[in-house]
Amino acid sequence: MYRVGIGFDAHPLEANKKGLYLGGVKVSEEYSSIGHSDGDALIHAIVDAILGATNAGNIGIWFPENEENRGRRSTEFLEIIRKKILAGKYEILNIDSVIIIDKVRMNPHIENIRLKLARILGISKGNINVKPKSGNTLYGNSVSVYAVCMLKKVGT
């Protein structure tokens, strides 16, 4: 049985020296996203896509905005979802994503992002696609991400 899920996340950006993380990779020293956790919109969208494909709720149910998750690295969210939702039950066939951001040029970071996500999920980077778009100034000081994943239920 095949399952498909879609995820979306968006965060405003602010100029500072904390740095912006997308896909677990620092992509900017000049900006950071404003969020309860580390604000990694790419991982948040992927987590929601996986949860949607498995009918397991959404990121807010699994990782609510509480003190435990304040400032938490989103890579931990993805690791938990891999262990509790995917492990032994589903195989990731494909993840496709679009990052819309005006402030940061993403192309130099795409391969590192794909490698990082592949390591966390235990899959080939060939199963992960990340497409950056500038937004043509329509999105201003923000980052928005759409992600889709296709899973196969193990044993079917």
Curated annotation (Swiss-Prot):
Site (Transition state stabilizer) residue list: H36, S134
Binding site for a divalent metal cation: D9, H11, H44
Cofactor annotation: a divalent metal cation
Catalytic function, reaction form: 4-CDP-2-C-methyl-D-erythritol 2-phosphate = 2-C-methyl-D-erythritol 2,4-cyclic diphosphate + CMP
Annotated positions binding 4-CDP-2-C-methyl-D-erythritol 2-phosphate: D9, A10, H11, H36, S37, N58, I59, G60
Cofactor note as given: Binds 1 divalent metal cation per subunit.
Enzyme Commission number(s): 4.6.1.12
CDD domains linked to this entry: MECDP_synthase
Gene Ontology process terms (BP): isopentenyl diphosphate biosynthetic process, methylerythritol 4-phosphate pathway; terpenoid biosynthetic process
InterPro entries noted in UniProt: MECDP_synthase, MECDP_synthase_CS, MECDP_synthase_sf
Similarity annotation: Belongs to the IspF family.
Function noted in UniProt: Involved in the biosynthesis of isopentenyl diphosphate (IPP) and dimethylallyl diphosphate (DMAPP), two major building blocks of isoprenoid compounds. Catalyzes the conversion of 4-diphosphocytidyl-2-C-methyl-D-erythritol 2-phosphate (CDP-ME2P) to 2-C-methyl-D-erythritol 2,4-cyclodiphosphate (ME-CPP) with a corresponding release of cytidine 5-monophosphate (CMP).
The protein's name in its UniProt record: 2-C-methyl-D-erythritol 2,4-cyclodiphosphate synthase
Lineage, opening ranks: Bacteria, Thermotogati, Thermotogota, Thermotogae, Kosmotogales
